[in-house]
Amino acid sequence: MLNDPPRPRRWPRRTAVTLAVLLVAVAGLYLRNSSTIAGQEDGQRPFLLAHRGIAQTFDLAGVTADTCTARIIHPPQVPYLENTLPSLRAAFDAGADQAEIDVQLTRDGRLAVFHDATLDCRTDGTGTVGEHTLEELRRLDVGYGYTADGGATFPLRGKGVGLLPTVPEVFAALPGRSLKLDLKRDQQADGEALAAFLATLPPDRLATVTVSGGDAAVAAVARRLPQVRTSSRAVIKDCLLDYAALGWTGHVPDSCRHRELPLPARYGRWLWGWPNLFVARMRTVDTRVILVRGEGDWSAGFDTPADVAELPDGWAGGIWTNRTDVVAPLLIPG
């Protein structure tokens, strides 16, 4: 009849079944990649990577590739100079799990530990590391250029003479310690020289090493020593793209094996299982996940209590810091 109320619309049975299957699949996908199933274990705390040991910090605002960061440091709170043995020892004494050092070849083929492309910013020398012999570099003051007041005073001047070490000296001085070696020049020869030294280490020592840097330099190390943990732009890109395609299944691709992945927290949310399930999955293939602050530019680390407060809840991976002495007491129980 024309006056009968409209009948309620019923979904076709096939549509209802399809929607139910989709809902179950989505729920399963969520649960399979939910970080809540891989929370922080009892007694576990973040892995602390001490960037260049304990280093002087500086304001990152306005920093570019050409900025002499030694000229813009904060008033020194510690007496240490980056990439020196006193700085590295202090970082480990404070609770660091790994220290990063910068590596360059000297004119006489030695593996020197120094960051900058030129000597002019931090030292009383000029030119590049590669233009000098190790003996010449030893005579420099690696604390010469540091100032917190625009050049009115230089509080670390005279305190860095003879402190520039070599890679073999760092290994000898820090037995058993985990080290990340960052090749500053993206040259195959630099990678081959570092690989030649690393090949002399026993397997248990080699297992504590990570090598990072440009694609060509790191690839040279990986060709000779594929068991060494590596990190470069190409390495990180290949791993994350492959994981984005396959990680929803729980599978970790081979491109993510034996890696160290420095990641800004803001990008982590796009990764299956972020944060702690992703970290746990990477750990199964001998890969470390290291959280860096901001965009990851200019060595931005978690250096203050306020920085530490930004960490994801229950973070079980690594963190990048220039001030292990400040952050370790906040993260290490007792």
Predicted regions and their residues:
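Phosphate-group recognition and catalysis centered on beta-loop-alpha active-site segments
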Residues: L2-G334
